[in-house]
Amino acid sequence: MIQGTTSDAGKSTLVAGLCRLARRAGVRVAPFKPQNMALNSAVTVDGGEIGRAQALQAIAAGIAAHTDLNPVLLKPTSDRGAQVIIHGKARMNLDARAYHDYKPVAFEAVLESYARLQAAYETIFVEGAGSPAEINLRDRDIANMGFAEAVDCPVVLVADIDRGGVFAHLTGTLACLSASEQSRVRGFIINRFRGDVSLLKPGLDWLEAKTGKPVLGVVPYLHGLTLDAEDMLPPELRAAHDGGAARMLRVVVPVLPHISNHTDFDALRAHPQVDFEYVRSGTPVPPADLIILPGSKNVPGDLASLRAQGWDAVLQKHLRYGGRVIGICGGMQMLGREVADPHGVEGAPGTSAGLGWLDYSTVLTRDKTLKNVTGHLALPGSPEVAGYEIHMGETHGPALDTPALRLGDAQAAHPDGAISADGQILATYVHGLFDTPAACAALLAWAGLSDAEEIDYPALREASLERLADTLAEHLDLPKLFAAIG
């Protein structure tokens, strides 16, 4: 089990790389995360929903993403509450106190999934969540040492040296653990190191002498990996390329408080002809060719935030001067006349006025749509698209008579989304639009980039997984690691 001294220490990436190394060796391997809290998710082969990081790890392992890989997923809907997803299905919304009381039930689901994986795979790389040293969460912990103790799983601690204080992180975390938990820790991995590793050796020697546990490797800072993020936005909000493209398309995504599935935009960030930028609250929206309203886990709340920022006026001006707008999932719902939440699915019951630019309305429902889809964009050339739907809501109205996509095969195609009468606005429930090369190029051409190149985002991701695995093979003491974890 890979546990971290902090969130974003590199647990997800390390598990992905280790899964790829095991796959190379011919080992039947699976990733596993008992509990994840994330708004980036993926649809599984069994029709459920798991954290995006576990879907990436499944790709690394060469297996289909299944709900057993992440049996408990928490999707925050507010600062104090989250939607609780068990074995891929939304069960309820709970606040933090109520979920703490529910944890024994959730843990049963965790152990059921783990037992099934044990029966099917030779090796399982387990990923912890946050830090095992959160004293206030130790009671009823199911994500870190609580799980490791229950199934007798060895643990490796990883820390991010790029943040500073790596030795304090490791020794401090260890000191916060019980004696039995400390004995479960087999060693340390130091992640994201820059510079001459020989200068780090005195610190490594001190750490090993202090704790009696080995340093299993120092992993360098890897720039330019194209891998799906678990939840956090990338630290570099702007991705501009200097490859000499004659025409760059400027794309902006406003960062809403409950933004979800921002992995939709990874392919755009990697595109050599796209100048991409996330814009946070309090920041002016720069001039752009295309503004994309992303998915949201709280559409009424994010609509209110959008208006409070004055972004509705910015979008209106953008359209008035000929700009293009795409709304994806929650963003699509915002573009309509209203969003009704009669059951309080995403907050207090009520109805919120939409932006009103497309003639349809949405009612949020208790049932969630979860499915992988294929089809064709309603753009020149009808390019193929493959993606997925994750939403709680039904949308109806005349604007849907001019759909943005047709999903399914030609004999049983059904419409999705809408394109405005003036052709400036495109709305869809489908995530992953830009991952398909032809669809991405067609959407960029629609937005004004007539000579858009096709880039193969899945191939870029695969190359990054291979590079990650090569790096781990070089910088981890794999014989010592595998001996330590048994």
From Swiss-Prot:
This is Cobyric acid synthase. GO terms for biological process: cobalamin biosynthetic process. It comes from Paraburkholderia phytofirmans (strain DSM 17436 / LMG 22146 / PsJN). Keywords: Cobalamin biosynthesis, Glutamine amidotransferase. Belongs to the CobB/CobQ family. CobQ subfamily. The active site is at C329 (nucleophile), H431. The gene is cobQ. InterPro entries: Class_I_gatase-like (IPR029062), CobQ/CobB/MinD/ParA_Nub-bd_dom (IPR002586), CobQ_GATase1 (IPR033949), CobQ_N (IPR047045), CobQ_synth (IPR004459), GATase_3 (IPR011698), P-loop_NTPase (IPR027417). Catalyzes amidations at positions B, D, E, and G on adenosylcobyrinic A,C-diamide. NH(2) groups are provided by glutamine, and one molecule of ATP is hydrogenolyzed for each amidation. Residues 248-439 form the GATase cobBQ-type domain. Pathway: Cofactor biosynthesis; adenosylcobalamin biosynthesis. GO terms for molecular function: ABC-type vitamin B12 transporter activity; catalytic activity. It comes from the Bacteria.
